[in-house]
Amino acid sequence: MACHSIEEEDNTIMGNFDALWNILDRHYCFFDRKGVDWDEVYRRYRPQAKACRTAQQLFDVCARMLDELRDGHVNLSASFNTSYYRKWWSDYPQNYDERLVLKHYLNFDYRQAGALTYAMLPQRIGYVSYRSFSSTIGEGNLDAVLSYFEIAQGLIIDVRDNGGGNMTNVETLVRRFITGRTLAGYTVHKTGPGHGDFAEPYAYYYDAADAGRVRWLKPVVVLCNRSTFSAANNFVSVMRLLPTVTIV
């Protein structure tokens, strides 16, 4: 049985700073894509870390360092705080108001099927709002919603301000809009500590919903905004590939 040693930094302010920097240096995937010189970031933030006297001061320095990645999926957690990168939405005007939609478009007259809010709009247009891919979508929920829209001419799927969640729910929803095996995207794995150490991309596919399930093959408009994030973005990217779908 083979084994290898794992380098551990000292449990000190500088040891913890270096450990965090090294973990990202070896495992983070998007330095080149984001144009981040991680070595330059180290040189800039290490003196700030060296001046720290408490864990909370170090946390703040490390959080600012991670913000250089401009990545909403990179967080730093401690017993007293969790850091998030927010500027991907906080630096821009908010362009979605759920109450405005419920009041002026749905007139507070809507149905709820699990995590899906839905209603028939004028001119026989179906409207479905899905607020979070963390909320499970049941197959029965989808059958009920799509059956309700049987006479609709088109369908609006609103994923504005949807912060993402479970990729399984993305697949469950997309399967209702395809007729057969459909390319959904590509996955690439990091294979080593170098910034360019990646395996070849491999494709993954979604299959159409099982026989007997209600499908929708008429026109679809997907509404998204800057706060459509993570798994919700993946949903939009897959739906964009379908010929009956328009992204707004």
Which residues does each PLM region occupy?
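Active-site neighborhood of thiol-dependent amide/isopeptide-bond enzymes
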Residues: 224-231
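Flexible, low-complexity junctional segments that flank or bridge functional domains
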Residues: 2-206, 219
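Short, well-structured beta-strand/strand-turn elements
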Residues: 155, 229, 242-248
